[in-house]
Amino acid sequence: MLFFLFFFYLLLSSSSDLVFADRRVLHEPFFPIDSPPPSPPSPPPLPKLPFSSTTPPSSSDPNASPFFPLYPSSPPPPSPASFASFPANISSLIVPHATKSPPNSKKLLIVAISAVSSAALVALLIALLYWRRSKRNQDLNFSDDSKTYTTDSSRRVYPPPPATAPPTRRNAEARSKQRTTTSSTNNNSSEFLYLGTMVNQRGIDEQSLSNNGSSSRKLESPDLQPLPPLMKRSFRLNPDVGSIGEEDEEDEFYSPRGSQSGREPLNRVGLPGQNPRSVNNDTISCSSSSSGSPGRSTFISISPSMSPKRSEPKPPVISTPEPAELTDYRFVRSPSLSLASLSSGLKNSDEVGLNQIFRSPTVTSLTTSPENNKKENSPLSSTSTSPERRPNDTPEAYLRSPSHSSASTSPYRCFQKSPEVLPAFMSNLRQGLQSQLLSSPSNSHGGQGFLKQLDALRSRSPSSSSSSVCSSPEKASHKSPVTSPKLSSRNSQSLSSSPDRDFSHSLDVSPRISNISPQILQSRVPPPPPPPPPLPLWGRRSQVTTKADTISRPPSLTPPSHPFVIPSENLPVTSSPMETPETVCASEAAEETPKPKLKALHWDKVRASSDREMVWDHLRSSSFKLDEEMIETLFVAKSLNNKPNQSQTTPRCVLPSPNQENRVLDPKKAQNIAILLRALNVTIEEVCEALLEGNADTLGTELLESLLKMAPTKEEERKLKAYNDDSPVKLGHAEKFLKAMLDIPFAFKRVDAMLYVANFESEVEYLKKSFETLEAACEELRNSRMFLKLLEAVLKTGNRMNVGTNRGDAHAFKLDTLLKLVDVKGADGKTTLLHFVVQEIIRAEGTRLSGNNTQTDDIKCRKLGLQVVSSLCSELSNVKKAAAMDSEVLSSYVSKLSQGIAKINEAIQVQSTITEESNSQRFSESMKTFLKRAEEEIIRVQAQESVALSLVKEITEYFHGNSAKEEAHPFRIFLVVRDFLGVVDRVCKEVGMINERTMVSSAHKFPVPVNPMMPQPLPGLVGRRQSSSSSSSSSTSSSDEDEHNSISLVS
C-alpha cells in the first residue's frame, strides 16, 4: 500500500512539473513523444515559426525545436534503453527528427527511473512475502506436535517401478534423459503429477515408452483426489535427521500442496539430478487421519519417514489409465497391518506387486537411491539414508550416527539383528495372506501369483530376505505388526504415540492385526467375510517365540497386556484370521474388569507454581514403584455395591434367606430399640399386660419414656399393621415388639397417659416444695434482724458520704445498692466500704452482748459480734433456694399438670367408644380412679402457687416500695440478697483474720506480727494504738445509741 502511494506521488509530482513549471500548455505536444502518432501519415518537417516565443531555457538555437513535433512513420518508436545513450550536453545536440524537448525528456526520465525502482521494490516485496510464506509453511510442518507430521504437503502419488529393467540400465537412461531434458522439464510442468491436476497423457506415454517400455501395471485414475496427511513423527527430538548433503539441497524445490489453502509445497518432486529408478520406484505416503472416501480404502503401512527433506519422490510415469480397473493404493503411516488390504491391492498385479513389496529399494526417508545402493542383499541396504555415507558405514557406525537417531528404534531393526527368523516370518505371512486371498474370488489370480513369489522369496538367504523386506518402500506389510500391538480401525485417527515409542516398549508384546470393514478392503466390490482360521496354522505359528519375530501368534491363553479395540461406528467389523475367539473374550474381560476401589486419602492438593521451585519438581515418576497387589489387599474399600455385584454373578434365590430382618424399620432405629429392650430386661407380654391394665407402677417411668421414644411413624405403623405371619420376610426383635404393641388399640396414647400418671406424684411434690420455699424466703427477709441492722448501717454510712449532694438525707434505697459497697475502696486501696460497715456491726453487736469495756472483753466482743454477723447467711437459707427458681418454669409445670388431666380424659373417652373389651375397661377404671385424686392435687398446687407469688410481690414492695412494679423478674429480690450474702460472708472471713492478728499482738509485751518478715512495732506506738482504740470504742458506743434513736424516729 505504501509503495502505491509513493508511486502515485511521483506521478503527480511529474505531471505538476509538466503543467505548472513552464506554463506551456499550447506549446507542448498533445501526445507523449515515446508513443506512436494517432494517424499513420506524418507531416513534413516544419521550421520553427517566428511567432513562437516559448523556448526551452537550455536551448540556445531557436530552430532546435519546431512548434509541431514530427513523428516519422517508418522507424518504430525508440526503446527505453535508447534514452540512456544521450550525451550530457543535450542542448547543443542537433537532431534532425527531434521528438522531445530537453525539459520533457528529463522529467520523463525521472518517471521512468521511479517506475523501474518501484518495479524492483515490488519484486523484492513479493520475494520477501514468498520467502516468509514458505518459511511459515515449513515451520507448520515441524512445530505443531498436536497435528500429524506429514500434512498435505507430503501427499505424493507415484507409479510403481518397472520390474524388468535392471537398476544400472535404468539409472543410465534416466541420467541421460534428465540431462537432455532439463529445460523442457521446467517448461512442461504438466508432466509432474500434482494433486488436483490432469496428467499430460502424451508426455507421459512417450516417457513411459522410452524408459520402461510396456508397463505391467495398469494406470491410476486421472482425476486425483486429495490424499490424507501422513502420521506425525517426533522429528523435533533429532534435528540432525533431516540434514542432507549439498546435492540434495540443490535438487530441492516445492510445489503447491493439496490442502484447502493450497500453499504448502510438495516436497521434492522429480528433479533432473535424481536417478530414474527413484522416479519409478516412488512411494505413496499418506495418513489415516484424513481418509476420505470408501473408494480409496486400501491401507498398507510403510516405515515412517524421518524428515520431509529425505523423501525423494519422482514424477509419475504411468500409461493410459483404465478407470474400470482402478485400485487406489493408499499407504497409511499407521503401525497396523491389514492383510486383507494387501490382498485386495494385489489384483491383476502379481509380479509387479511382489517386486514392489520385496524388491523396491526406495523407502521414503530410510532408504537411498539405487545408484548408491550397490549391495542390495546387505542388511544395511534398507537403512542407509545418505548416498555419500551409506556404503562406508558399518552397522555399528550407523547405529551410533546422530542422523539416524530417530530411526534407531525403527521397526525393521529387529530383522537386521536376527535375520535367521525370516523364513519362519515368511511362512507365517504366507499363511495369513493365503487365508485372505482365498477368501475373495476376485483376488484369486493375484493371490496365487503373489504366493508363488513368496515361495521363491523364502528360498533366499536370511540376509537377503531381511534386506529385501526391510527395504520395501510401498508395501512393507511386515513392519506394521511389529510396531502395533493394538487393533486399529478405519475410524481411528493417527496414534498419539509414535511408532518409535510403541516399538521400544512393546517388542515382546504380541501384535494384534487390525480389524477392517468390508468397505475398507476394496473400493468397488466388498469381499465376503473370511473363513475361520485353521487350527494347524495356529499350532505352527505359536512355536515361534523369538523376540524379533513379533508377528508370530502368542499362546492363546495369554491376552495382550493392553487390549485396544475401536470398532467402526457405521461399518460392520470383521474378525481377523489371526485373532482367536479366546483372545477376544480375554481382552473384552480385561476391558470390562475395573480396578478395585481403594479407601480415599483425604488431603489438600497444592497447585503447582511455575514461578518458584518446589520440592515436587525433583520427584521422578520412575523412582518409586507401587505394589499394586499389596495396596489393593490392604486398603480395599468396603462398598455397599459388593452384595449386588455378587448377586448378579450368582443365580437369585426364589425364597428369601432366613436372616433377612429389619425390613420395615430403619436399621439404626431398630438397633436402638433392641438395645433398650435388653437394658430394661422386660418381655413383650409384660409390657402388653401393663398397657392393657393401665398399671404404670409395673412398668416404671424409665420404661415408659423408652416406649415413647420407640413410637413409629405413620408409614412404619402402616407397614407393621399390614404384616402377616405368612409373609416371607422375617421381622427382627424390635419389629416384633412394636407389632405386638400396635395390636393394642391406641397403645402409645396409653403409654403417654401412663407416663403422666407415673410422673404426677413427683411433679406435684416438686411444685409444693418450690412454693413453700418461696413463702419461707419471704418470711425470712421480713423477720431477719441482722439483715435489718446491715441495712441501717449502710443507710447511715451513705448519708454521711453523700452530705451536701442531692443523694444525701435518704430514707431508703433499693437492695441493688448492697452489691455496690465493695466497689467503694478506701485510701489504702484494700479496705472497702463493706469492710467498714461489717467491722462496725461486729463491734456494736459484741458490745451489746458482753457489756464490758476492758481490753480482754473487747477482744471477746469482737468474736461475739463476728459470729452474729456470720450467721446471717444461715438465717437466709431459703432466700438462696428461692433465688435458684424461675417463676416461668413453675408456671409451666402447673399448666402441664392441668393439660395432662385433659389428655387422660380424652383417652378414656376414646377407649370407651371404640371397644367394650375387658382389657379396655380395666384401663379406663384405673385412669378414672387416678383422675379423682389428681384433680384434687392440682387444685391445691394452683392455690399454693397463687399464695407464693403474692408473698413474693409483697416482700418486693416491702423493700422497694412502689418501684416493685418496675421489676421485670418477680424473683429478682432473692437474687440480689443471695449475691449480697455471698459478699458479706467473704468479708466476715477477712475481718476474722484481722481480729486474730490483733489478739496475738496484744497477748505479748512485744507483740510479734503475723508475718515474721515485717518489722516489729515500737512500744510507744502500741500504747498509742491501745489508747486510741479505747477512745474510739467509747465514741462508737455513744454514736450507736444516737443512731438507734434516729432509726426509731424514721420508722
From Swiss-Prot:
Q: Name one GO cellular component term.
A: membrane
Q: Where are the transmembrane segments?
A: 108-128
Residue span, FH2 domain: 588-1010
Q: Does the keyword Transmembrane apply?
A: yes
Query: So which domain of life are we looking at?
Result: Eukaryota
UniProt cross-references to Gene3D superfamilies, sorted A to Z:
Formin, FH2 domain
The question of whether Flavoprotein is a record keyword is answered with: no
Q: Which GO terms describe its molecular function?
A: actin binding; actin filament binding
Low complexity bias: start-end ranges? 49-71, 180-190, 278-301, 401-410, 459-473, 484-498, 1027-1038
Which proteins does it associate with, and in what oligomeric form? Interacts with FIP2.
Q: What is this protein called?
A: Formin-like protein 1
Query: Could you tell me which species this protein originates from?
Result: Arabidopsis thaliana (Mouse-ear cress)
Q: What is the lineage of its organism?
A: Eukaryota, Viridiplantae, Streptophyta, Embryophyta, Tracheophyta
